Design a protein with these regions (language model features):
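Short S/T/G/P-rich N-terminal loop/turn motif that feeds into the first structured element of a domain
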Residues: 1-52, 56, 65-67, 89-94
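Conserved RNP beta-strands of RNA recognition motif
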Residues: 60-61
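Conserved short beta-strand edge segments in small beta-sheet-based binding/regulatory domains
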Residues: 79-91
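Short amphipathic alpha-helices in soluble, non-transmembrane regions
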Residues: 70-78
């Protein structure tokens, strides 16, 4: 099942601004950690560091058994997790 996990953080607290934050993101999204979590990361996009707005956003499309698995993967990183489907699947219902 596909899920979209969206993360928002203040630009002033962007993890890409610190060595520790960069290392944490690198570890979280490592192939080993993704495999261990039992998910498939199908797409990931960040508005930072290009975004100069007050808040930065991260968008993660994940294939997983359920939303709980997705939330657990992110640990202490706050995410809004929602089930999604492709536009092609939605179009079939129109």
């Amino acid at each position: 099942m596909l899920f979209e996990a969206t993360h928002t953080h203040p630009a002033t607290m962007c993890p890409l601004k610190t060595t520790e934050g960069k290392a944490s993101l690198k570890q979280l999204f490592s192939d080993q950690n993704i495999k261990k979590a039992g998910i498939k990361l199908t797409a990931a996009y960040f508005s930072c560091p290009k975004d100069t707005a007050l808040d930065h956003k991260g968008f993660f499309t994940i294939d997983a058994d359920n939303a709980v698995t997705v939330t657990k993967f992110f640990g202490t990183m706050a995410v809004d997790v929602r089930p999604i489907q492709t536009l092609k699947e939605v179009a079939k219902m129109l």
